């Protein structure tokens, strides 16, 4: 009889030592339970202590699973669902952490400067009206045109019809005067020279009595 009592006390002592070593934050989980409103059930799995232990291991991050001494797995929450929930939560938290800095900075800048006024650090570009841009383009074009010397056109200008007529009339007068002055006097007619020679021969014959 005494050996059975000592054996049971030794077993309970090992249980409580294991309980103390594996439930360092048990008080935090038990704090979420409203002990006044809840009562122990009729079974071991429905006691307040058991519920607190299940809640404690379920909220561990990362989830390590339920210890075997806590009870049968069929009586405990689904470990696979708990792991999937934690993974989804971690991914969502990581994405929001990467997205939030840039989004919050843009949102902060827009809230501080809703009218697009350039900030003091010079990162925000200055807004330029469209009319000013067109005016600058026109001024640049005008200054470049005045600075560049105009090239003389190598293409000859075509004269008008009146100019061509006056030029052709002047050329015809010049050619007529040149022809008049440079044309040689035609020699005397050859037939008239022959007749004069015959007349001289006749007079000479008459003088000599032939």
Swiss-Prot record:
N-acetylmethionine: residues carrying this PTM: 1
One GO term of the biological process aspect: protein transport
Compositional bias (Low complexity): 142-161, 172-183
Keywords: Acetylation, Phosphoprotein, Protein transport, Transport
Region of interest called Disordered, as start-end residue ranges on this chain: 88-210
Cross-referenced Pfam families: Mso1_C, Mso1_Sec1_bdg
GO CC terms in record: cellular bud membrane; cellular bud neck; cellular bud tip; cytoplasm; cytosol; nucleus; plasma membrane; prospore membrane
InterPro entries: Mso1_N_dom
Source organism, top-level taxon: Eukaryota
Segments of skewed composition (Polar residues): 117-141
Tagged with keyword Phosphoprotein: yes
Phosphoserine, modified sites: 102
Record's function text: Involved in secretion. Component of the secretory vesicle docking complex.
Subunit and interaction comment: Interacts physically with SEC1.
Miscellaneous section: Present with 1380 molecules/cell in log phase SD medium.
Protein name (database record): Protein MSO1
Organism expressing this protein natively: Saccharomyces cerevisiae (strain ATCC 204508 / S288c) (Baker's yeast)
Gene (name only): MSO1
């Amino acid at each position: 009889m005494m050996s059975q009592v000592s054996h049971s006390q030794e077993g309970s002592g090992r249980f409580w030592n294991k309980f103390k070593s594996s439930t360092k934050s048990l008080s935090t989980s038990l704090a979420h339970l409203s002990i006044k409103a809840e009562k122990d059930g009729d079974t071991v799995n429905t006691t307040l202590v058991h519920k607190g232990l299940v809640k404690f291991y379920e909220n561990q991050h990362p989830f390590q699973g339920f210890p075997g001494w806590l009870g049968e797995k069929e009586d405990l929450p689904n470990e696979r669902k708990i792991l999937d929930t934690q993974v989804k939560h971690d991914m969502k938290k990581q994405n929001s952490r990467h997205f939030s800095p840039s989004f919050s900075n843009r949102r902060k800048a827009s809230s501080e400067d809703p009218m697009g006024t350039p900030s003091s650090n010079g990162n925000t570009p200055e807004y330029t009206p469209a009319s000013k841009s067109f005016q600058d383009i026109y001024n640049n074009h005008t200054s470049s045109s005045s600075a560049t010397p105009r090239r003389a056109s190598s293409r000859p200008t075509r004269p008008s019809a009146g100019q061509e007529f006056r030029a052709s009339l002047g050329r015809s007068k010049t050619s007529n005067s040149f022809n008049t002055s440079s044309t040689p006097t035609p020699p005397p007619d050859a037939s008239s020279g022959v007749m004069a020679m015959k007349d001289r021969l006749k007079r000479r014959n008459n003088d000599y009595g032939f």
